[in-house]
C-alpha cells in the first residue's frame, strides 16, 4: 500500500530487462481498485490502497513471439471474503475453458461456454437475477490468437482450433460498485489431442498468491 501503480509496472519491466528481455509484448497494465474495472486501463498513476486488488496484464517478447498474461493480487497480501468469492468464480471458469480447448472446437463454442459459465457465476454471486445479463460485468471475449502479434492476425475471428495454434483464455468479472476487477489470463497451446498451458507456472490460486505475498513483500 502507498506505492503507485507505475512503480509496480516499473518493477516488472526492470526484472524483464535485467534478465535479457529486449522487448515487452505491450505496455504493462497495473490497475488497482476500481481502475481494474476498466478493460484497457493505461494511466498506471493511482496510489495502491490496502483492501483493494491490483490487476496486472503483462507479457514479454521472446524471438519475436509474445506472451499475454493477467493475474490479480490483493494489495494487502490477503483477499477479503468477497474478493476471494469472486476470484474463485473467475478461476473456475478459467480452468474449465482451458480444459475445453482441443482441435475441432470453435472459438464460437468456447465463447458461448464462457458466457454461460460467467453468467451463472454472476447469479451465484448475487450480482444478477438473470444470467443472460452477464455483459454488465463481463464485456469482452474469452480470448484471442497469440503469436508474432499480441492479438495475432486471424481473418475470421470465429475459427476452429488446430494443433500449433496459441490462444489466450482470459475470463474476468468487473464490478465497479465494489471496486473489484478480476481477470485471470493464460496462454494455451493447442496440441494434437488437447492443449498445454504455457503459463501454468504462474501462480493463480488464492492459496498460492497469499503464500507468495507473505514471503515476498516489496517495500
Model segments located where?
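Active-site neighborhoods and metal-handling regions in enzymes and metal-associated proteins
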Residues: 1-219
Amino acid at each position: 500500500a502507498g506505492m503507485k501503480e507505475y512503480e509496480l509496472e516499473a518493477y516488472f519491466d526492470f526484472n524483464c530487462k535485467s534478465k535479457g528481455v529486449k522487448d515487452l509484448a505491450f505496455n504493462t497494465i497495473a490497475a488497482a481498485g476500481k481502475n481494474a474495472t476498466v478493460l484497457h486501463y493505461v494511466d498506471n498513476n493511482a496510489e495502491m490502497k490496502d483492501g483493494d486488488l491490483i490487476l496486472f496484464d503483462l507479457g514479454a517478447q521472446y524471438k519475436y513471439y509474445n506472451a499475454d498474461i493477467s493475474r490479480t493480487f490483493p494489495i494487502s497480501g490477503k483477499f477479503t471474503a468477497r474478493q476471494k468469492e469472486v476470484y474463485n468464480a473467475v478461476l473456475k471458469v478459467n480452468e474449465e475453458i482451458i480444459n475445453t480447448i482441443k482441435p475441432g472446437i470453435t472459438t464460437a463454442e468456447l465463447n458461448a461456454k464462457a458466457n454461460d459459465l460467467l453468467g451463472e457465476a454472476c447469479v451465484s454471486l448475487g450480482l444478477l437475477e438473470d444470467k443472460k445479463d452477464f455483459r454488465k460485468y463481463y464485456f469482452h471475449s474469452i480470448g484471442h490468437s497469440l503469436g508474432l502479434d499480441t492479438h495475432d492476425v486471424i481473418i475470421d475471428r470465429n475459427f476452429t482450433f488446430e494443433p500449433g495454434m496459441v490462444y489466450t483464455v482470459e475470463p474476468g468479472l468487473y464490478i465497479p460498485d465494489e471496486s473489484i476487477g478480476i481477470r485471470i489470463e493464460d496462454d494455451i497451446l493447442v496440441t494434437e489431442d488437447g492443449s498445454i498451458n504455457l503459463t501454468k507456472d504462474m501462480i493463480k490460486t488464492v492459496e498460492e498468491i497469499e503464500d507468495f505475498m507473505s514471503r515476498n513483500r516489496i517495500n
